[in-house]
Amino acid sequence: MTTDDSTNSESRDPSAAHRAALPKLEKNMKRIQDLTQRLMGAMSNKRKVPQDLQGPAPELYSKAGTVAFQEMIQNPSKIIEQQIGYWGKTLQHFVDAQQAFGKGELAAPVDDTPTDRRFANPLWQSHPYFNFLKQQYMLNAQAMDKAVTEMEGLDDSEKRRLEFFSHQIVDMLSPTNFLATNPDALTKAVETEGDSLVRGLENMIADLEANDGELVVSLADKSAFTVGENLATTPGEVVFRNHMFELIQYAPSTEKVHTTPLIIFPPWINKFYILDLKAQNSLIKWIVDQGFTLFVVSWANADASSRDIGMTDYVEDGYLTAFETVREICAVKKVNAVGYCIAGTTLSLSLTVMKERGIDYVNSATLFTTLTDFSDRGEVGVFLNDDFVDGIEAEVKEAGFLDSYFMSKTFSYLRSNDLIYQPAIRSYMLGEAPPAFDLLYWNGDGTNLPGKMAIEYLRGLCQNDKFATTGFDVAGISAKIADVEVPICAIACESDHIAAWKSSYQGVQKMGSKDKTFILSGSGHIAGIVNPPTKKKYGYCTNDDLSVSPDGWQAGARQHEGSWWPMWGDWLAKKSGKKIDARTPGSASYPPLAPAPGSYVLRAKVV
C-alpha cells in the first residue's frame, strides 16, 4: 500500500521523480569530473605524429583552389549552374519543411535522398528536426562531390586524391558523428540517465591511454581472445627459428599426405593467424584436412634493431632459408608456395632470384591478393605520393622502423565509416563495449615494418613500379616480372581496397609462366580470402583467357557459387605428387622447438 501511494505521489508530482533521479545524476557528474582528469592526463602524453603523416601536402588543396578559381574566371556559367542547382535544392527543402511545420504537422517533408545505413534510425525519416539535418547534409555532400568530380585542370592522380580526401572531410562532418545531432545517442542518454555517456567517456579515455594519447577506437573486445587458446589453435610445432621468422609445421589430420609440401608466407604487415582464426574459418586447418603437409611462416615483429633489414634480407634469410629448411625436413627437392599480399610480391621477387641463380626449389606458386604490377595502385594509392612517403622516410630514419600505428591508421581511413566513425559512435556515444569479433581483434594486432624494407618497398615497387618495368634491385640481381616462370595460381578479390584486382591480373599477365590460373573472389582483401566452403558466401569467377583486358576477362568469366578453396585445392593437388604416409612435425636436423603458434606471434621479438 505504501509503494502504491509513493508511486501515485510521484505521478502527481513530477518533481518527485526528478528528485529521485538526482543522486544518480550527481554520481554521474562526479564520475565525469574524475574521468576529465584522466582525459587531460592522456591528452598531455599524446604522441608526436609528424605533420607529413597527418594528411596530404597543402599543395594539393592550394592547387585545387587555384584550379577552381581559374575555372570560375574562365567558365563562370558552369560555376553559376552548380551553385544555382545547390541553392535551389537547399531552399526548396527549407520551404517544404517550413510549410509542413506551418500546417501544425510534426512530420518531415518528402525525402528523396538516397538510402544510407548511417541514417537507419526511423527518426531520420520521420522527425522534422533530424530529417532536416539529414537532408541538408546529403545535399551538401552531393554538391561537394559534384564540384570535385567536375573539376578540370588536375591530373588523374591529383583528382583521385582530392576526391578521396574531400570524401573524408564530408564523412567526418556527418550529423551522426555528433552527440547533439545523433538520435540514437540522445535517446540512449535519456533512457540510461546519462550512464551511456559516462561509459562512452570511459571507453574513449581507455583508448587514448592505450594509444599514447591518439584516439584509436577499439574495434574488438581484447579480453575475449587469446592467441593459442581460442585463436590460432590448429596443432603444430615450431621447427625452425632465425632473426626473421619462426617456421611452423602443422600436425597431419589424415593418414596419407601429398609428397610435395606447401609453405605459406603471410604478409608481415599483420600476423599470420588471420588464416587460422577459428576452426570453422581456418584456411590452415582446411589445408591440413585436405592431406597436405603444411608449413607457415610467422614473421618477427620489427623494432629499432631492425633498421637495416631490407627486401634482400626477406628474400635471403626469409624465403630461401624457409625453402631450404622445408626441403630438408620433408626430404624433397621442391615445394609449393603461397604468398599473401606483400608476401606474394616478395615470393615473386624470390622466384626471379632463384631463376638467376639456377635454383629450382619451387614447383608452383599461389598468390593471394598480390600486386606485382603497381601501375595502378588502387584506392591505397592516395597515400603513396611523395608527401606521405617523404614523411614515412623521415619517421623510419629516426625510429628505425615503421610503427604499426601508421599502417593501421592508413587502412582504416580507406573504410572510415566502417572502421572509425561507426565504431566510435557505438563506443563513445552509446557507451557500448566493443564486440567479441575475432577478425577485428586480429585487425588490431598489427606489426611494425623494418625501416629499410619499408622504404625500398614504397619507393622501388609502389611508386616506381620497377619489378614490372625496368627491374627491381634485390639480392644482387635486377628482378623482372617476366622471369616468374613457375606455374601460377592467383586469387584476387573484387572489392579489394588494398590490392586492386585489375592490377593483380595485369601483373599475372606479365609473368613468364606458361601455366597461369586467375580466380576472382567476391568481397575484399580479407573476407574474400578467408571464405570457407561451409559459409557458402561471395562466390568467385574464372576465365581461362588471360590475354584480354581485365574488363574483358571479367565480362567473359564464368560465375561459381561458394568458396574458391575447393577449386584451388584441386589445382594444388595436381602439383603435389602422389600420397605418402603422413609426416609428423620436425626431423632429426630440425626437432620441434615449441608448440604452435610459437612465440613470434605473441610478442615483438625473441631475444
Q: Which ranges hold each PLM region?
A:
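Alpha/beta-hydrolase-fold enzymes
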Residues: 152-188, 328, 332, 346, ...
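Short amphipathic alpha-helix adjacent to the substrate-entry channel of hydrolases
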Residues: 276-294
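Short beta-strand element of the alpha/beta-hydrolase
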Residues: 257-268
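Amphipathic, low-complexity, repeat-rich surface-exposed segments
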Residues: 1-246, 257-258, 295, 507, ...
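Short beta-strand/loop motif that positions the catalytic acidic residue
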Residues: 490-492, 496
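Short alpha-helix in the alpha/beta-hydrolase fold that links the catalytic acid
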Residues: 500-510
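Gly/Ala-rich beta-loop-alpha elbow adjacent to hydrolase catalytic centers
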Residues: 339-344
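Alpha/beta-hydrolase active-site loop
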Residues: 306-330, 346
